[in-house]
Amino acid sequence: MPDKSWHLERRTFLKGVGVTLALPWLEGMSWSNDRGSAATPPNRFCTVYFPFGIADLTENDARAQFGWWPLGEGRDYQFSKTLEPLAPLRDQITPLAGLDHPAGYELGGHGTAGIFLTGGLRNKTRTLNRVSADQVVAEHLGRETRFQSLVCSTEGGVGALLNSNTLSYDRSGNPLPGIAEPSALFDMLFGAAQARQTLRTQASVLDRLLESTRELNGQLGAADRRKLDEYLFSVRGVEQEIVRARGWLDTPNARVDAAELNLACNIKNDPRAYLRVVYDLLFLAFQTDSTRVATFLTGNMRGESQYSAAAAWPKAAGVREEAHKVKHDAGSKPEDASRYDAFLLEQFAYFMTRLQDAREGDATLLDRTLLLYGSSNSTSHANTNYPLILAGGRSLGFKHGQYLKFPAKRVPMSNLLLTAIQRLDVRVESFADSTGVLSELT
């Protein structure tokens, strides 16, 4: 693990009366690489996904103000009521229309969250995904951080491929489980004792598993051995993470005062507080350089949304109907969908503002953090014309303050993902079904 050094210790703390607080970035804390020479602060990438689509109203509709899309286009666009929470951040965002994944056209309306960052499944039998864009970036940006990436999800775990609880998939197309509980996320990021215990448990389980599979392998036929080999390939990924974690055990965790965070909240008792504390933890993870890549799925696409975390969002926004129905009825009751989506955007704007208010040398964390916010549905779960917002990343060359509309079904969203990947200094020529980069963004 690289040894990071600063002119002042980066993880310097104020101590007193039993409280420990991590200091913010100070001018004396200039970045340096592992050889001690001056280096630019790191780039970061975060994707946030919301389920069930939007009120997809045309500009000629009398109720267009309650739709998702801005009115007008280019630099003269006007915010809809739905997007108004982002108005103070206008010069930091680019709403996008017309992009989607052609590979998702034939999937059911509830089946595309898992391909949002992958561009499409790997096989026609719909059993294997591709690597997600965040993991391509994490392989590059995550080399010098304690955690290669963070995977957050209101549901936790992985779900099913066509009903995913995670946005992140590894090189083999295997899902990476999301963390749902704020307290668990905090302990993972900042709890040194917890990290040691977790590592011991994981290592013990892995050792027993590998021993058992070695004994089993000799008893299996050829077909079963192939299946077992595929499984063990995934297990080796876990083994590599354990080796990685061991390399960081003697490096102190960044220390953050838990008393400043509402870790006890949950989605049911306080949806707004839940979203904000997850965003707080993502902010702290970036600020302390614990990771440089993160994803956050704010609800899966289960049709029975009363069993999904997404059930909490309409209630918090003052909408009586459950999440799934709100979006199915968005054409006839766009006001409800607007309040629902504006509530989620209000919390995303809170995250953006925290990043914007945090200075890092001659820029801000937001300038060096590329954010992608969106859904893989438009109206009534149609898998076309995704509602997308690109934000931040001005130090990476992104130019905001405009609304870009691309021709329908002509430009794959993979072009956006390729643009992001390349701007984050990852050397790739293509991603999924990309046909090029979006030069309009830079």
Predicted feature locations:
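Ligand-binding pockets and gating/stacking loops
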Residues: 1-442
